[in-house]
């Protein structure tokens, strides 16, 4: 029985034992699979965590080691390759088994060999096939000698065994007669061997005509799955028990003689078959090697394609990065161009304002240098201008008074409209109350006498609750209003069981309390309306008084104004404000364009700065200028960072100037320092501006910016 086990490292040993003894001759074929691997590998090809082939231990060529389909196919291919090799070796071994079987069928009893140790002549043939397919190739190695030497020795042993059998049969006693009969199984086997020899000869001739064909893996799988050819059915009886072997065999009856095949012819036929099988094996090995070379070539091509694809992908990513960098550079360049254009426009506007200011200053100087008669003329012109301005102001006042009167009229009209709306609302409420009153009367008059008695026994609060419930009764309710009133009265009656037995009144007393209640309600509503009208009149009077006060205040303001001097001051203030706004906008533009690229909250520009201290962030009008650390960096040398800071603060109007003085006290540390002094314009509580002095940048930052930031 041949059994193939697919495991990690396959050690297939093909043992062919040919033993001739006095008792019987046994021929057996054993194929043993020895697993020499240290790890116990499962024979499950559907293992999901399969990273190596379970047959050849070869790492899978698929990119995904967990790919189930790829691992199964690879294992089947290895299985096909190994099974083909084993199948061919099995065919080779059958010929030796047949030889022994022929001797058994013909009842050829080998004679005992004269040996000092054993009386039996046994020829043991061991073929070890070790398939350690780390590279996918199957190699056949013998433990003691090579395959070719083994084949030559095997052939010599077979000839020697048959010669010894022939001589032993001839020199045996008369009891050991040889029956030259041939079995029908041997004839069938000879016919099958002749057919196979013709097919092999035809196939070999066809292969020589054609160029060496390549057997694909699919064909190998079909060969593996196809049933084997009908071999000679060799019945090898199992070895009998010891008792049967010891019993003497009965003497066989002589059989009729048949045509006996000479042993030399049989050996030649077997040798020819063996040669043909060896040739087929060599051809199949060559085809297998060619197929492996083609597969290796395809794998190399795939690897080259994969490398080329990776190179192209890297190039594509590099191009994308270059394009993104170019886009960013262009965007930055466009922003810089826009900022430069805005800066140029604001510079032009600032220059225009400076020119206007210079012209005004020149005109004032020229006016001061003119003689007195020109000044008199100017005074006259100024007086005329003042009169004209007064007339204009008077006209403006009249226009404003007219506007105020129009507003008052509009307010009065609005108040009248509001009063009318309120009266309409009151009338609507009265109409609704009358309708509700008539509705209630109609319902209560329809009530039977017991319910009227219950109604009369209710208190005023209970009646008001009943009125509201009846009026809020939805029309979609299947219960009619009369039924609803009756149910409500029944509920009140249950609550007032004690009063129901004491009170008994007539039916006609229903309308009197209702009329009294309505009259009281109307009187209350009239009083409320009168109160509302009085309140509205008071509000109108207050509004008129406020309007009169506003007019008086406006007239006083117009009278207090000095026309010419105040206008000139206002004009100068406007010019200063415009200049400050332009300076601040220029500062923002210049610092965004120039300072931020190398000072954006990262490093201090001071000399000998370890850059490990906490930085102060400078803010001007809620806008970050840059950061600086609190170390004094060479006040005498006046480092780059301080120079940038002072220039920024001077442009922003926070610090006006830098002077040297030894008589001024620092506002931050209260010390007199004869070094660089900075002073700041700040708005005081009186409305003006005061000057504060600081001896260093640390005092300035600690007192102004850093403390403010902490308080926030």
Swiss-Prot record:
Domain of life according to the entry: Eukaryota
Comp. bias (Polar residues): 178-187
Low complexity: compositionally biased ranges: 10-46, 107-143, 161-173, 188-198, 241-264
Organism name: Dictyostelium discoideum
UniProt protein name: Putative uncharacterized protein DDB_G0268364
Annotated region described as Disordered, given as residue ranges: 1-46, 107-264, 370-389
């Amino acid at each position: 029985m041949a059994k193939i086990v697919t495991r990690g490292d396959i050690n297939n040993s093909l043992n062919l034992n040919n033993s001739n003894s006095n008792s019987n001759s046994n021929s057996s074929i054993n194929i043993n699979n020895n697993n020499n691997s240290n790890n116990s590998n499962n024979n499950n090809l559907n293992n999901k965590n399969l990273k190596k082939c379970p047959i050849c231990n070869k790492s899978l060529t698929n990119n995904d080691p967990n790919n189930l389909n790829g691992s199964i196919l690879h294992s089947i291919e290895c299985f096909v390759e190994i099974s083909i090799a084993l199948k061919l070796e099995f065919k080779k071994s059958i010929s030796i088994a047949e030889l022994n079987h022929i001797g058994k069928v013909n009842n050829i009893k080998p004679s005992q060999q004269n040996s000092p140790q054993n009386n039996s002549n046994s020829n043991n043939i061991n073929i070890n096939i070790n398939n350690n397919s780390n590279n996918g190739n199957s190699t056949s190695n013998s433990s003691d000698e090579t395959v070719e030497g083994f084949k030559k020795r095997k052939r010599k042993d077979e000839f020697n065994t048959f010669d010894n059998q022939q001589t032993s049969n001839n020199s045996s006693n008369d009891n050991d007669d040889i029956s030259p009969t041939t079995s029908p199984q041997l004839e069938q086997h000879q016919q099958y061997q002749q057919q196979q020899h013709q097919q092999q000869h035809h196939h070999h001739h066809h292969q020589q005509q054609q160029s060496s064909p390549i057997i694909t893996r699919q064909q190998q799988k079909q060969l593996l799955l196809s049933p084997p050819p009908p071999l000679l059915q060799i019945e090898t009886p199992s070895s009998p028990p010891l008792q049967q072997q010891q019993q003497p065999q009965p003497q066989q009856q002589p059989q009729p003689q048949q045509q006996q095949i000479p042993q030399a012819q049989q050996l030649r036929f077997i040798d020819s078959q063996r040669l043909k099988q060896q040739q087929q094996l060599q051809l199949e090995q060559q085809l297998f090697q060619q197929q492996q070379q083609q597969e290796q070539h395809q794998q190399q091509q795939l690897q080259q394609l994969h490398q080329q694809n990776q190179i192209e992908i890297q190039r594509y990513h590099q191009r994308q990065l270059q394009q993104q960098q170019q886009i960013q550079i262009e965007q930055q360049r466009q922003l810089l161009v826009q900022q430069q254009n805005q800066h140029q426009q604001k510079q032009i506007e600032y220059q225009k304002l400076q020119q206007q200011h210079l012209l005004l200053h020149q005109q004032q100087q020229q006016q001061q240098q003119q003689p007195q008669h020109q000044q008199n003329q100017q005074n006259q012109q100024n007086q005329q201008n003042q009169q004209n301005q007064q007339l204009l102001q008077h006209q403006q006042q009249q226009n404003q008074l007219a506007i105020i009167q129009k507003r008052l009229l509009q307010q009065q009209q609005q108040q009248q409209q509001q009063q009318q709306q309120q009266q309409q609302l009151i009338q609507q409420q009265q109409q609704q109350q009358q309708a509700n009153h008539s509705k209630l009367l109609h319902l209560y008059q329809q009530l039977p006498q017991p319910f009227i008695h219950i109604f009369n026994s209710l208190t005023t609060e209970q009646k008001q609750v009943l009125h509201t419930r009846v009026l809020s009764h939805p029309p979609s309710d299947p219960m009619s209003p009369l039924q609803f009133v009756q149910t409500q009265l029944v509920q009140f009656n249950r609550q007032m069981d004690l009063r129901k037995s004491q009170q008994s009144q007539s039916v006609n007393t229903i309308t009197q309390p209702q009329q009294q209640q309505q009259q009281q309600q109307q009187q209350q509503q009239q009083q409320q309306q009168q109160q509302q009208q009085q309140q509205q009149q008071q509000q109108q009077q207050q509004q008129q008084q406020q309007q009169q006060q506003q007019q008086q205040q406006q007239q006083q303001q117009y009278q207090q104004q000095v026309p010419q001097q105040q206008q000139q001051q206002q004009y100068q203030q406007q010019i200063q404000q415009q200049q400050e706004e332009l300076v601040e906008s220029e500062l923002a533009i210049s610092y965004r364009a120039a300072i931020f690229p190398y000072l954006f909250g990262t490093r201090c520009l001071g000399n000998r700065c370890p850059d490990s201290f906490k930085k102060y962030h400078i803010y001007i009008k809620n806008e970050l200028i840059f950061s600086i650390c609190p170390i004094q960096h060479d006040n005498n040398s006046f480092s780059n960072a301080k120079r940038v800071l002072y220039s920024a603060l001077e442009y922003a109007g926070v610090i006006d100037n830098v002077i040297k003085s030894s008589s001024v006290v620092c506002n931050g540390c209260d010390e007199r320092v004869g070094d660089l002094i900075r002073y700041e314009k700040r708005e005081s509580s009186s409305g003006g501006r005061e000057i504060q002095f600081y001896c260093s940048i640390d005092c300035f930052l600690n007192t102004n910016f850093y403390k403010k930031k902490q308080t926030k």
